[in-house]
Amino acid sequence: MTNSNNGNGGTNAAASGWLGFSLSPHMASSTMDEHHHVHHHQQQQQQQQQQQHHQQQQHGLFFPSVTTAAAAAAYGLAGDVVAATNGYYSQLASMPLKSDGSLCIMEALRRTDQDHHGPKLEDFLGAAQPAMALSLDNTSSFYYGGGGAAAAGHGQHGYLQACDLYGGPAAPSLVTAADEEAAAAAAAMASWVAARGAATAYATGAADANAAENVLPSATAAQHLHHPLALSMSSGSLSSCITAGEYGMAAVAAADGGRKRGGAGGGGQKQPVHHRKSIDTFGQRTSQYRGVTRHRWTGRYEAHLWDNSCKKEGQTRKGRQGGYDMEEKAARAYDLAALKYWGPSTHINFPLEDYQEELEEMKNMTRQEYVAHLRRKSSGFSRGASMYRGVTRHHQHGRWQARIGRVSGNKDLYLGTFSTQEEAAEAYDVAAIKFRGLNAVTNFDITRYDVDKIMASNTLLPADLARRNAATTTSKDDHSAAGAGAIVSVHSAADIAVADTLWKATTAPRQQQQHHDDVVLSGADQAAFSVLHDLVAVDAAAAHQQQQQQQHMSMSAASSLVTSLSNSREGSPDRGGGLSMLFAKPSPAVAASAQQQASTKLMAAPLPLGSWVSSPPASARPPAVSIAHMPLFAAWTDA
């Protein structure tokens, strides 16, 4: 009897058009055993129903028959049946479900009698029936729709006699209607099994048959056993019982055990867990040398040196001694920095004997200066190819950018883009002096910059304005050169006139030798300006044209004087040198030598009058006038 309870419950639900699920655990059995029990209970159907009804009346225990007709009457689906049974309803084997799997409790469940309460969840899960395992697994839940042709022998298998839940047998017509509907449901079940195939029918039918056999006891045993319903909600692999007695727990355990044994071949082996590779291992950062790391993206090597003193300056990360293409070069840079910071007793990568020359070099430098020296000798850094501190090269347009770090909230400050890396390095130096004072590590010598001017400014000065005395010195030189040029240009004409008057006054008493004196005057003029030519490098013109010679000499003297003043910083008048030094009165020995040189040049100079003019003796010629006696230059020097 018990083997076909579930099967007929599902088929009766199919005949009434309801969606239902089977009240059975998952047990494994064979299809042949199910058919054997079905035929066996077909022969004993009437006798068992009468015996069950008689026992229920004697002991007062009500295990009402759960027929589809009774369910339809309870839910108001068959009006004539409800009227015949006076609104009776039974413990349902096929529960209506919503689309989400929850129970559908309809208003039609309420009784018409006001003295009786409506059905509650306890009516479905109460203790007035034998313990049953309720499973929602898809392997034993059947959903049917529609009816089929009648088939004899499946009417009452697994169903108790329809009785009122509150006492009294149901009408005999209810049993007759249930037999007809059960036969139609059996035919629908047969067609469904054929459609699903032998494999599905085997798995489903075996599970239902064995579940009914192991869970539902006989009617006689049910009279003395009172167990609560064991509710098991299974997802196919595990069963979690909410409330269950000893009998229900045993049934669920047996069902789960059989299913686990059946699936041990496929899911019993534990799959190995593959851990995902950490993202930190993207690119190797290790090196065989101490203090050297390999940049993750560029592949270049960096030398790092960590010193606790850098924490005082707000630095929270390792100091970098530059980037290198070769791992060995980076290791040697670390060794040199470590030797400077911690001495010869520290651990280094290479023998100490390899650094004897560098040890002598670093004695004259401070730590920061030597680290800056190491950085300048590196082949650039990982983010740029510049050898200067704080300078990187833009990866798109190739221009040089200057940045200084850890100046405003431990962030980098962008200083601008420059055409050359030297300009960017100067911009970094100015910013470093502004934010870090005299202890700043700069790319160039700090004496190159006007530190006081940089510190006093409210903004970052451009590099050309921050250089020490660069603008002041240039302006002074320009002013001195311009002044000297103006003086020479103003007095050039007066210079020529005074010199001409002087020569004429000297030769005036000798009128008897007019022709000879003119020649001597021409020669003396040439000799006087030859001395000036020796001093300021004036190239004289031909000596036979006096006016042309004087004009040329005056212009060349002015040009040479301006050139001399502009090329020498000591040439400015306010420095106490220059023209006073150049045109100071010579000593007697120097004057005598100049006169002798002038006489020699006068004798060697070609005369325009021809070879018939004889040269006068040295005693008859007037002495050459030295440049120290010229009134123009004497007045200018005294001023």
Curated annotation (Swiss-Prot):
Belongs to the AP2/ERF transcription factor family. AP2 subfamily. Keywords: Developmental protein, DNA-binding, Nucleus, Repeat, Transcription, Transcription regulation. It comes from Oryza sativa subsp. japonica. InterPro entries: AP2/ERF_dom, AP2/ERF_dom_sf, DNA-bd_dom_sf. Induction: Induced by auxin. Coiled coil: none annotated. Highly expressed at the base of the stem. Expressed in stems. Expressed a low levels in crown roots and seeds. Expressed in the stem region where adventitious (crown) root initiation occurs. Residues 43-59, 547-561 have a biased composition (Low complexity). Signal peptide: none annotated. Disulfide bonds: none annotated. Disruption phenotype: Strong reduction of adventitious (crown) root formation. Residues 25-59, 258-277, 547-579 are annotated as: Disordered. GO terms for biological process: adventitious root development; negative regulation of cytokinin-activated signaling pathway. One of its GO terms (cellular component) is nucleus. It is found in: Nucleus. Pfam families: AP2. PANTHER family: AP2-LIKE ETHYLENE-RESPONSIVE TRANSCRIPTION FACTOR, AP2-LIKE ETHYLENE-RESPONSIVE TRANSCRIPTION FACTOR CRL5. GO terms for molecular function: DNA binding; DNA-binding transcription factor activity. It comes from the Eukaryota. SUPFAM superfamilies: DNA-binding domain (SSF54171). CDD domains: AP2. This is AP2-like ethylene-responsive transcription factor CRL5. The lineage of its organism: Eukaryota, Viridiplantae, Streptophyta, Embryophyta, Tracheophyta. Residues 288-351, 387-445 bind DNA. Acts as a positive regulator of adventitious (crown) root formation by promoting its initiation. Promotes adventitious root initiation through repression of cytokinin signaling by positively regulating the two-component response regulator RR1. Regulated by the auxin response factor and transcriptional activator ARF23/ARF1. Its main location: nucleus.
